[in-house]
Amino acid sequence: MAIRVYKPTTAGRRNASVSDFSELTRSTPEKSLVRKLSKTGGRNSYGRMTSRHRGGGHKRQYRLIDFKRWDKDGVPAKVAHIEYDPNRSARIALLHYADGEKRYIIAPEGIKQGDVIETGAQADIKPGNNLPLRNIPTGTVVHAIELRPLGGAKIARSAGAAVQLVAKDGAYAQLRMPSGEIRNVDARCRATVGEVGNSDHANIQLGKAGRARWMGKRPITRGESMNPVDHPHGGRTRGGKPPVSPWGKGEVRTRRPKKASNKMIVRRRPNGKNRK
């Protein structure tokens, strides 16, 4: 993948860039593998806003991605197409299995049309092949990793994501996450060899607010610029207040401190200036 930078012909084009989509081989999805996708606008079933700054955006169809490949052990598949998926940053690959079934998977870096993909403990160590962590050599880069055996891929699914298998200790495998955290995962869990493709996605510049709106993202307004009736930070009085939400709630961590899987973390991710 490469990045195409626009010439500054207008204010919106200045500093804007897009993917050149050169790796794609088809523009329309497989009809049997798409489903309707309804928009919520950040509202729940009561119509109340539960997620701010969401709404609008282009219509999308959801592509059914196979995150549980264990039921295809021993069945080879050929990569029929590399396609765009509007619901994720990574590209997706359409596989045609030898038994006639078609499925989508996350497209790894380096995969191309016509490649043969395998699944199972005896599969070769090459990008796109899926096998248990206990059968993967130490030092290998993997993605689409299960947290529980047969639970489906949960970790490292976005563009450019890569996790390194650093050690094996009995029933567990140690993985170095993109954040730098090292954690134990059951060695029976499956992973796909290689890193996720489309790694240049992080370098794309939207260039204008309109492109964010096409993606369903609405503007963010600072609480300090509002009136007191709208936000605790509103009005001319400044300082003396800890940051809070519009409803007066302080900063809330998104991870429970007593989460059961904490015991699987060998080393926490580096913080602040120690992060690389």
Curated annotation (Swiss-Prot):
Pfam families: Ribosomal_L2 (PF00181), Ribosomal_L2_C (PF03947). SUPFAM superfamilies: Nucleic acid-binding proteins, Translation proteins SH3-like domain. Residues 35-58, 218-276 are annotated as: Disordered. The keyword Phosphoprotein does not apply. GO terms for cellular component: large ribosomal subunit. It comes from the Bacteria. Part of the 50S ribosomal subunit. Forms a bridge to the 30S subunit in the 70S ribosome. This is Large ribosomal subunit protein uL2. It comes from Bifidobacterium adolescentis (strain ATCC 15703 / DSM 20083 / NCTC 11814 / E194a). The lineage of its organism: Bacteria, Bacillati, Actinomycetota, Actinomycetes, Bifidobacteriales.
